[in-house]
Amino acid sequence: MLTTNTLAVLLLLFLSLCSGQSPPAPEPIAADGPSSPVNCLVSMLNVSDCFSYVQVGSNEIKPEAACCPELAGMVQSSPECVCNLYGGGASPRFGVKLDKQRAEQLSTICGVKAPSPSLCSVLGFPTISPAGSEDSSSGSEGSDKDKKNGAMTTKYCGVALNSLALLLLFTFLSLS
């Protein structure tokens, strides 16, 4: 039987293999990741004080005072929803177009340790591209092909991670 330490090492090894892939970010739409944006609706509502800071065109120098405690609560209760925030999950539901740089810097500004956008991508959650970047793309066939290949890599890493997580769960349950 595998020990807990062996399983942890295998998980870390697998994560490092998948994180070596660098797929381009998907379009800034609310695509479903492993956890549907509907599951994060309450968490998104709870960080609504952050929206005025992270929206495209915001002139605010810092987030509202209530934003940082709300973000810390989201990270503690449902960190996958932070990935949803990076992925634009707030955009269609609340009419907020997110500025990628501001969304990614929010945890640093608030002093909250949150999942990084690159980790969210590895785990299969969409992340948004920089504001306006889709308008400035050349639209060449080569770049479209690269985007599709990157999306496939992320998809398969996400599926493999989910399978590995289930394997770990069953192993831990059988050890009990």
Swiss-Prot record:
Belongs to the plant LTP family. The gene is LTPG12. Disulfide bonds join 40-83, 50-67, 68-110, 81-120. This is Non-specific lipid transfer protein GPI-anchored 12. Pfam families: LTP_2. It comes from Arabidopsis thaliana. One of its GO terms (cellular component) is side of membrane. Residues 150-176 form a propeptide. Preferentially expressed in the endodermis of hypocotyls and roots of seedlings, and in petals and anthers of inflorescences. May also be expressed in siliques, carpels and pedicels. It comes from the Eukaryota. Keywords: Cell membrane, Disulfide bond, Glycoprotein, GPI-anchor, Lipoprotein, Membrane, Signal. Probable lipid transfer protein. It is a lipid-anchor; GPI-anchor. Glycans are attached at residue 46. The lineage of its organism: Eukaryota, Viridiplantae, Streptophyta, Embryophyta, Tracheophyta. Residues 1-20 form the signal peptide. A lipid is attached at residue 149 (GPI-anchor amidated asparagine). InterPro entries: Bifun_inhib/LTP/seed_sf, Bifunc_inhib/LTP/seed_store, LTSS. It is found in: Cell membrane.
